[in-house]
């Protein structure tokens, strides 16, 4: 498949974004909520678990960037997870339970879910082509 360097940079970029987002929210969620005049969460431990998982999903994207041909299960998981994050954030933004700025990470996730889908489509298409002799 051509452009593997481009796709590696896509997965590496998302890895950095996701790890940074998970770490930042893990340590600064209450500060961010105060800044946005948003209500604090009742169960901080659940959000900390989620933010920790977000960080480790970023690590998984790093694994993908370093071995694109063998980590398609992680890519499929990423498509599902990122689409779900967007759907939840869009819903809660629409009904007014979260500040609209919280939708920005959801939009970023949706963009990467689309990019991941394009990658899988192109990769499977290129693998299905018969070898020319």
Task: Specify the residue positions occupied by each region the protein language model found.
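Membrane-water interface at the C-terminal end of transmembrane alpha helices
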Residues: 111-133
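Cytosolic juxtamembrane helix and N-cap/initiation of the first transmembrane helix
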Residues: 1-17
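Membrane-interface helix-boundary motifs at transmembrane edges
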Residues: 2-6, 66-72, 98
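Core segments of alpha-helical transmembrane spans in multipass integral membrane proteins
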Residues: 16-26, 42-66, 77-87
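Hydrophobic alpha-helical segments of small multi-pass membrane proteins
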Residues: 75-89, 105-116
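Membrane-helix boundary connector in multi-pass membrane proteins
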Residues: 69, 87-104, 121
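Membrane-interface helix termini and inter-helical loops of multi-pass transporters
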Residues: 30-41
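Juxtamembrane helix-break-helix junctions at the cytosolic face
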Residues: 32, 60-73, 93-94
């Amino acid at each position: 498949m051509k452009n593997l360097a481009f796709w590696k940079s896509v997965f590496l970029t998302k890895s950095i974004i996701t790890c940074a987002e998970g770490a930042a929210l893990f340590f600064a969620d209450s500060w961010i909520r105060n800044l946005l005049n948003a209500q604090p969460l009742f169960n901080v431990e659940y959000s900390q678990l989620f933010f920790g998982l977000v960080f480790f999903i970023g690590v998984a994207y790093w694994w993908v960037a370093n071995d694109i041909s063998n980590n398609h299960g992680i890519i499929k998981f990423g498509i599902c997870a990122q689409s779900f994050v967007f759907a939840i954030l869009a819903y809660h933004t629409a009904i007014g339970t979260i500040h609209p700025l919280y939708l920005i990470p959801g939009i970023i996730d949706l963009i990467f879910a689309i990019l991941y889908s394009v990658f899988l489509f192109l990769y499977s298409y290129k693998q299905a082509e018969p070898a020319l002799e």
